[in-house]
């Protein structure tokens, strides 16, 4: 039987999942996105050439891999067409390698308009969304009024359904948010112009994956964002609108939950966060600037500067718990090169003086938290591009070992640079 491996983020996203998925897909036959939308930004660097993917799975660059967008993904037709066009211009036959679930909810212009209108109305209390309509599209899905890829098979019925939902959302946009209405005809004309392209890629994803599993094929599930942004388990309300955890794999793809064999958690060697929300280890000093500059911490999707801080082992332990992680991939270790001292948060001191070694459950519980740090010597020798475990500086090895001790999870892969080749695989998830 084949192995099914999940790759997901253990922090607030931007951990380096895309590179790891691309690397491991050398052995996989299928790569599946199961949640999120084009709010993701997965950066791949292969032989020095950079590719940023937002919606299409990171396996698309591999000839032997079928990439699948599962039902848990909210799909923006315009974003998909743009991404397909960019890849096809480079000679990548996307339409031969990409398949879609007919149950994917569609993100349409009124979702984007609502997203931006709401963020503007929130003012200082804005969530910090990407403004791409992700949340409103999931709202429509749950409210059972959303349009899906399957609706594109009947264009006459689609036109009627679209008119109803455009009128519904325009009422709110115009009368409550005092912004312009979305143009129904322009939306309809565009979607119908590309409908046949999308429907040609539709398959029964659950059936396909079950057949692949029975044949012994290797399947990889690619998560987007990170565990601490999960709609249920994250720092609510400063979260995304989907289940970013391992539990989302089954519901977002149609694979049976017993058929997940290994869950790889991507953990950055320090912490970052985009947008508002709790971040106990955030640094506002020159070390924070150092991490931002050395790590090039600017969003692949929005270009926004990421907030930076020390590694939070308490938060990562929560990810271990929720996702039943099998192993870690430690990324961006090289960014810490040159620091005289590195720190890991091992607990929180609450405003009343109590110490905690677990994360609060509600956003209010994070207020006033002070991180309790454990300090370790840094290293001056470079780890950038190192491909042998034994050649890492001893202080870096000690740092890795301490992460394993604090979380109870082995580091199976170490990334020492952005390129596919700058990686050490100590234990292959497909063989674990």
Curated annotation (Swiss-Prot):
It is found in: Cytoplasm. InterPro entries: Adenylosuccin_syn_GTP-bd, Adenylosuccin_syn_Lys_AS, Adenylosuccinate_synth_dom1, Adenylosuccinate_synth_dom2, Adenylosuccinate_synth_dom3, Adenylosuccinate_synthetase, P-loop_NTPase. The keyword Endoplasmic reticulum does not apply. GTP binds at residues 13-19, 41-43, 306, 332-334, 415-417. Disulfide bonds: none annotated. One of its GO terms (molecular function) is adenylosuccinate synthase activity. Binds 1 Mg(2+) ion per subunit. The active site is at 14 (proton acceptor), 42 (proton donor). Mg(2+) binds at residues 14, 41. Its EC number is 6.3.4.4. Its cofactor is Mg(2+). The keyword RNA-binding does not apply. Substrate binds at residues 300-306. One of its GO terms (cellular component) is cytoplasm. It comes from the Bacteria. Homodimer. Belongs to the adenylosuccinate synthetase family. NCBIfam families: PRK01117.1, purA. This is Adenylosuccinate synthetase. It comes from Serratia proteamaculans (strain 568). The gene is purA.
């Amino acid at each position: 039987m084949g192995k099914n491996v999940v790759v997901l983020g253990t922090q607030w996203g931007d951990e380096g999942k895309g590179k790891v998925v691309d690397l491991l897909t050398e052995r996989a036959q299928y790569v599946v996105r199961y949640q999120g939308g084009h709010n993701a930004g997965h950066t791949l660097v292969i032989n020095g050439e950079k590719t940023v993917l937002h919606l299409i799975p990171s396996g698309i660059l591999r000839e032997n891999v079928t990439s699948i967008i599962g039902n848990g993904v909210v799909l923006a037709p315009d974003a998909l067409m743009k991404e397909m066009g960019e890849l096809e211009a480079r000679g990548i036959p996307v339409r031969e390698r990409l398949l879609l679930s007919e149950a994917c909810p569609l993100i349409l212009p009124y979702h984007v308009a609502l997203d931006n209108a709401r963020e503007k109305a929130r003012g200082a209390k804005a969530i910090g969304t990407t403004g791409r309509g992700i949340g409103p599209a999931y709202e429509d899905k749950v409210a059972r009024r959303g349009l899906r890829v399957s609706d594109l098979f009947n264009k006459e019925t689609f036109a009627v359904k679209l008119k109803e939902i455009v009128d519904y959302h325009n009422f709110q946009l115009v009368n409550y948010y005092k912004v312009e209405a979305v143009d129904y005809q322009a939306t309809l004309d565009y979607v119908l112009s590309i409908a046949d392209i999308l429907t040609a890629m539709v398959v029964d994803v659950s059936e396909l994956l079950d057949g692949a599993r029975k044949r012994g094929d290797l399947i990889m599930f690619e998560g987007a964002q990170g565990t601490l942004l999960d709609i249920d388990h994250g720092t609510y309300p400063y979260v995304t609108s989907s289940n970013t955890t391992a539990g989302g794999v089954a519901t977002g793809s149609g694979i049976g939950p017993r058929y997940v064999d290994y869950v790889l958690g991507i953990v950055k060697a320090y912490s970052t966060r985009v947008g508002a929300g709790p971040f106990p280890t955030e640094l506002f000093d020159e070390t924070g600037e150092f991490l931002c500059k050395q790590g090039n911490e600017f969003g692949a999707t929005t270009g926004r500067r990421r907030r930076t801080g020390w590694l939070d082992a308490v938060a990562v332990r929560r990810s271990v718990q929720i996702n039943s992680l099998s192993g870690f991939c430690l990324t961006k270790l090289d960014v810490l090169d040159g620091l005289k001292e590195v720190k890991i948060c091992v607990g929180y001191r609450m405003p009343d003086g109590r110490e905690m070694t677990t994360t609060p459950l509600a956003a209010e519980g994070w207020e006033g938290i002070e991180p309790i740090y454990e300090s370790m010597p840094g290293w001056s020798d470079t780890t950038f591009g190192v491909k042998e475990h034994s050649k890492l500086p001893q202080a870096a090895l000690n740092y890795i070992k301490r992460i394993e001790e604090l979380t109870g999870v082995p580091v199976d892969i170490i990334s020492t640079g952005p390129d596919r080749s700058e990686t050490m695989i100590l234990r292959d998830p497909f063989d674990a």
